[in-house]
């Protein structure tokens, strides 16, 4: 064998040995018996029976205090010296108070004379957040869990709008979706076809099994006095410290790796992750490719740590290297953190200019892991988990208004980076990003291209077809949207959302026979979606099934009494189809109590005032509608009628001219204007 062949052989051998060390065989990873899907969860009380000391310590941590009934919360908020919070974008004031032992949040509006013209109250049923940094409050109505608009920010000791509300104020109606609840609480009985419906009561905080996996097998083995130990490992329950590097990281990353958007693998949801498996087998987490170097979110610990040279140069640095999850972080001594750094960075061997700050009693974290505001949560002081050299750290300014979107961003899968990206998952991510974050059409164009090409190669992708339908629908291509939804249903005949979207498309296209049947199929698969019931009411009404439409609107309201649109729609049916003026008026008032800026309810109230010859209120409601949309033609029509009846003919002419300018084909306005000129 010549030297060249020997060199190639040796090189190849070294490569194989290297691969054996860097890519461990998955079959060598210990298998924990509680990974089996048949093993059930038992709850923290079972754990506490044997592990009382650990349990009593854990319930004092941020995770152990992540979600709890509002009545059980130790008062740390200031309910007396709290000035109202004003949302100038929407002209609402907010205030939190204690009323008969309940935490109540109030929304109100005042007019130019200082008179209160709107008020809405909601009781906080649960607190979300440990109080280490903030407390946010949620209310539960018929199982629908919704966020309240004010948060107590502990670091600044102040009330302010809840995270995200400075940009988009969803008032009392922001849904707490499953993925959000999953990382703030233990395992819930969530209704999968809903957006935010849970079977109550809800658990009280993140529990032991979130990090250790389901405990039934472990508990039963102890009851049966079975010795499952092999060496130091009990394979009936996961202890994260015995997991391989990536699986150990993933236990924490299930919640501490936020990203921009997550997309679940086919047939997976949050609860399918169990400690001991890889997180990427359950979901893909997408990041912004070109994000600002030192901008971080409140749940970006893993992402930021992964950018650290300490992490990149180590095969053993994980979250629990520095954190004991059973002990409140405030009880970790500064020395304990320093010792972890000194295990690799002995001061004697450091080549540094600043010797004074690199003694054994120095504070490594203070200099190398700076604290500051986050990009998504206002008024907090949080530790950046990217370990850096102080001289190169450049803090990014943080706005309480959250991110200001300009040009579209590029998303990249955290786990795969740009290597072999899953185009279907990425396409879904762009559609969801458009719907939830940034309404820029380029996301939809990119998603359609990705999904079309990938689905031609692998068409058995239910979520891929559904989101392709959504992308087409959102771009106005209703024909291709319908085709994609039918592909979705071909693969999942019980896909309630696809049937609901087919109903919406049929309504838009005035296919009045098809629309009701599509909504019925959706309701048959899942009967608790108020939006589908409301749309079903539309379809029935347009098909002249008035009584059935009335029942559908009523069902929507019974499911969600906060559903302003359903009140308005039922009111219109009662007023215009059944001449039930009083009942219609009550529904419009209920709508306006929930949404004082509901332009159609305001218009309907002005019409009722006209019927009752109450010209003053007819004018008032019409003018109020025009403050919301100055081009709202129906309100000008009401004003023209009011002015004409009052003999204010010049004003009537001006308003009619405005109508014609906005709607050149409005023959009625032209006819009335011509008659007034004569």
PLM regions and their residue ranges:
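Primarily the internal scaffold of c-type cytochrome electron-transfer domains
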Residues: 25-31, 38, 53-128, 136-141, ...
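Structural signature of tandem alpha-helical TPR/SEL1-like repeats
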Residues: 440-449, 475-487, 508-521, 542-555, ...
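Helix-start (N-cap) detector for alpha-helical repeat units in TPR-like alpha-solenoids
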Residues: 462-463, 496-497, 530-531, 564-565, ...
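Terminal, low-structured helical/coil segments at or just beyond the last alpha-helical repeat
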Residues: 611, 637-641, 645-678
């Amino acid at each position: 064998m010549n030297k060249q062949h020997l060199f190639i052989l040796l090189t190849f051998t070294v490569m194989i040995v290297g691969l054996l060390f860097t890519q461990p065989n998955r079959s060598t990873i210990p298998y924990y018996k509680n990974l089996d899907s048949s093993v059930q969860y038992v709850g923290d009380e079972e754990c506490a029976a044997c592990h009382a000391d650990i349990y009593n310590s854990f319930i004092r941590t941020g995770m152990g205090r992540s979600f709890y009934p509002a009545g059980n919360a130790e008062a740390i908020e200031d309910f007396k010296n709290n000035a109202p919070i004003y949302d100038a974008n929407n002209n609402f004031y907010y205030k939190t108070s204690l009323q008969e032992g309940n935490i109540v949040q109030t929304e109100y509006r005042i007019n130019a004379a200082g008179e209160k013209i709107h008020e809405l109250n909601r009781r906080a049923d649960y607190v979300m957040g440990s109080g280490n940094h903030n407390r946010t409050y949620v209310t539960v109505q018929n199982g629908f869990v919704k966020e309240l608009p004010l948060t107590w920010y502990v670091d600044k000791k102040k009330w302010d709008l809840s995270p995200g509300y400075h940009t988009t104020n969803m008032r009392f109606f922001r849904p707490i979706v499953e993925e959000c609840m999953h990382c703030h609480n233990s395992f819930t009985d969530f209704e999968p076809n809903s957006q935010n419906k849970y079977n109550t009561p809800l658990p009280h905080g993140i529990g032991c099994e979130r990090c250790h996996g389901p405990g039934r097998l472990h508990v039963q083995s102890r009851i049966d006095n079975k010795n499952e130990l092999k060496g130091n490992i009990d394979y009936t329950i996961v202890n994260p410290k015995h997991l391989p590097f990536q699986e150990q990281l993933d236990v924490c990353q299930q919640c501490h790796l936020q990203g921009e958007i997550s997309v679940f693998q086919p047939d997976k949801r949050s609860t399918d992750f169990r400690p001991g498996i890889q997180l990427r087998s359950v979901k893909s987490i997408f990041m912004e490719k070109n994000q600002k170097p030192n901008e971080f979110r409140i749940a970006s610990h893993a992402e930021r740590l992964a950018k650290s040279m300490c992490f990149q140069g180590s095969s053993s640095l994980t979250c629990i290297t520095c954190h004991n999850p059973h002990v409140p972080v405030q009880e970790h001594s500064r020395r304990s953190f320093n010792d972890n750094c000194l295990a690799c960075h002995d001061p004697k061997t450091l080549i540094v200019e600043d010797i004074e700050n690199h003694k054994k009693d120095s504070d490594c974290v203070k200099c190398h892991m700076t604290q500051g505001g986050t990009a998504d949560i206002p008024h907090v002081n949080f530790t950046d988990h990217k370990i850096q050299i102080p001289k190169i750290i450049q803090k990014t300014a943080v706005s309480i208004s959250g991110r200001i979107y300009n040009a579209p961003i590029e998303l990249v899968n955290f786990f795969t980076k740009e290597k072999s990206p899953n185009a279907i998952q990425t396409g879904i991510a762009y559609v969801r990003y458009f719907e939830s974050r940034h309404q820029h059409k380029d996301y939809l164009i990119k998603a359609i291209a990705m999904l079309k090409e990938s689905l031609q190669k692998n068409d058995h992708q239910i979520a891929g077809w559904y989101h392709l339908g959504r992308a087409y629908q959102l771009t106005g291509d209703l024909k291709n949207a319908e085709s994609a939804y039918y592909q979705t249903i071909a693969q999942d005949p019980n896909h309630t959302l696809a049937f609901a979207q087919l109903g919406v498309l049929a309504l838009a296209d005035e296919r009045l026979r098809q629309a009701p049947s599509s909504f019925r199929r959706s309701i048959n698969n899942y009967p608790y979606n108020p939006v589908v019931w409301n749309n079903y009411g539309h379809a029935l009404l347009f098909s002249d099934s008035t009584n059935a439409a009335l029942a559908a609107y009523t069902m929507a309201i019974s499911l969600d009494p906060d559903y302003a649109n359903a009140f308005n729609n039922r009111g219109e049916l009662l007023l215009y189809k059944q001449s039930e003026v009083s009942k219609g008026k009550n529904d419009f008032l209920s709508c306006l109590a929930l949404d004082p800026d509901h332009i159609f309810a305001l218009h309907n109230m002005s019409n009722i005032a006209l019927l009752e010859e109450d010209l003053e209120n007819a004018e008032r409601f019409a003018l109020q509608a025009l403050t919301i949309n100055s081009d709202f033609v129906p309100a000008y029509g009401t004003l023209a009628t009011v002015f004409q009846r009052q003999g204010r003919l010049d004003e009537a002419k001006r308003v009619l001219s405005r109508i014609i300018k906005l709607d050149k084909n409005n023959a009625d306005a032209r006819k009335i204007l011509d008659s007034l000129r004569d």
